[in-house]
Regions:
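Bacterial Sec-dependent N-terminal signal peptides
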Residues: 1-23
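N-terminal "domain-start" segment that seeds a small globular fold
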Residues: 19-42
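Short, internal strand/loop/helix patches
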Residues: 30, 97-144
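Amphipathic alpha-helical repeat scaffolds
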Residues: 33, 53-57
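Conserved helix-turn-beta segment immediately C-terminal to the redox Cys motif
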Residues: 47-48, 57, 61-84, 104-107
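Short histidine/acidic/glycine/proline-rich micro-motifs that form metal-
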Residues: 57-58, 85-90, 117-119, 162
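Thiol-/selenol-based redox modules, centered on thioredoxin-like
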Residues: 126-129, 133-181
């Protein structure tokens, strides 16, 4: 009987450990900014968080302008935009300092920009690994300027591909709906 009970406990612990990530919230992750300072999503609990993988040499780079406008318009209502530079698609070759300078001088970006990191593959940042495991392939960036909206509850509400502009009606209505929740 002891052996069966022990076996049951071992099997149960494997099962719960394998599913523990599903209980994790986006607000349990953190990034470093371009200067190495921590950007903890826990600081944005009860806010709507928009995580976007970005790049300075992409055909969608002009979306920085729309992201900044969105940040400015909804910041006081509790929206936080977090830009995540990535060279996974070979369009962000710059250093962290170059990325920061580009964002500030070209688009007046004042929302948090992380250090350059991987958003796909075996070396993807844990946030993106979590998003994929919990929300499927739709949460995985297929290109730069993939957008992940996190609700006030810390869970992914929706994802939008690169072709969806930050000014699109569907995108804006998702943001506004989350602000009402």
């Amino acid at each position: 009987m002891k052996k069966i009970f022990t076996l049951f406990i071992i099997m149960f612990s494997f099962f719960t450990k394998g599913n523990a990530q599903y209980d994790q919230l986006a607000t349990e992750f953190s990034f470093n900014d371009t200067e190495g300072k921590e950007i903890s999503l826990a600081d944005y609990k009860k806010k709507v968080i928009l995580v976007v993988n970005v790049a300075s040499r992409c055909g969608f780079t002009n979306q920085y302008e729309g992201l900044q406008a969105l940040s400015k318009k909804y910041k006081d209502k509790g929206l936080v935009v977090v830009g995540v530079p990535s060279n996974n698609f070979r369009q962000e070759p710059g250093t962290n300092k170059e990325i920061k300078d580009f964002c500030e001088t070209s688009f007046g970006i004042d929302f948090p920009i992380t250090e350059k990191l991987s958003v796909i593959g075996s070396d993807a940042h844990p946030f993106f690994v979590w998003a994929k495991k919990n929300y499927g392939s739709g949460a995985v960036p297929k290109w730069n300027f993939h957008k992940i909206i996190i609700g006030r509850n810390g869970k992914v509400v929706n994802t939008f591909s690169s072709i969806t502009k930050p000014s699109s009606n569907r995108f804006i209505s998702t943001i506004e709906k989350e602000h009402k929740n």
